Amino acid sequence: MGQKVKSADAAVIGKVPSVEHARMTRPVRPNLGAGALTSYGFAIQAAIGRRPMRYLVGRRFIDHSAVTALFVLQPQILAGSHVWITEDSARRECDVETHIPTMRNSVRLVERYLFDCLPLTDIGYLDLMAWRYPGLGATPEDVEVDMSWSRWPAAEPRCYLGPVTTPGLTVTEAVDHETGMVVARAVERLRQPLRRWEVVEMGGPEVGGLPERVRASRVRNGGWTDFRRVGEPVPVPQEAFDAGPARLRETLERGLSGKAA
């Protein structure tokens, strides 16, 4: 059965807002936050069949801005690739750049590609962002959504229309009431599922719930890919992010030595 998603503006003017309305309008915590750490890195591993995949992730928060970097260590065909995401939640800005070793320069992704995945993986660009992509609708839509596939039945689904560059696209995010975190996400076009992502195992309070394990799926391909965090996040000097991708990767490799080798 689908769940009815209520708009954040659905409370009747002049009445005391309901508990459900208060939940709907409550701010959502940043994705992949690590508690008190504001500049940090962690390692991830996964596998598609017998092909291992290993990544390093760096994240820095400064006020209302965030920088997120993902570096591919394996598979070998993608080794040396990276994704660089810069966000400013106050200005509602988000830029995503990708680089693979065969490129002379990094490429800034146009908006319609931001709802897809890194090449040869199930890692979605949306899943790496600190906040909901600003090009989505400002408030949830009053529509039926199907989140029956998710292991978070009590989480509150919020469905947002995609930008004009992606007609018919919607993104539904399910928010856990206890933590305020997005724990499941579905991307659909014309009501047909394209991608799904969800938290499988939440991290402890000492790391702000940074997931221990998530899974993702390109629905048309069938099956799920499990991504596991290897060890705890480590502090990273903020200036390492200003030095550019190559220097940041070196810093992450030193700090996470042995966790994603």
Regions found by a protein language model. Give the residues of each.
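Positively charged, low-complexity intrinsically disordered regions
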Residues: 4, 55, 60-61, 214-219
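Short, low-complexity, Pro/Ser/Thr/Gly-rich segments in the mature regions of secreted, periplasmic
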Residues: 246-260
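Short, low-complexity, intrinsically disordered N-terminal peptides in bacterial proteins
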Residues: 1-16, 261
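Gly/Pro-enriched, hydrophobic low-complexity segments
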Residues: 71-75, 86, 95-99, 105-110, ...
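Eukaryote-specific, intrinsically disordered low-complexity regulatory segments in nuclear proteins
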Residues: 135-137
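N-terminal mature ectodomain segment of secretory-pathway/periplasmic proteins
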Residues: 9, 15-102
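Catalytic cores of nucleic-acid ligases and guanylyltransferases
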Residues: 2-7, 101-103, 107
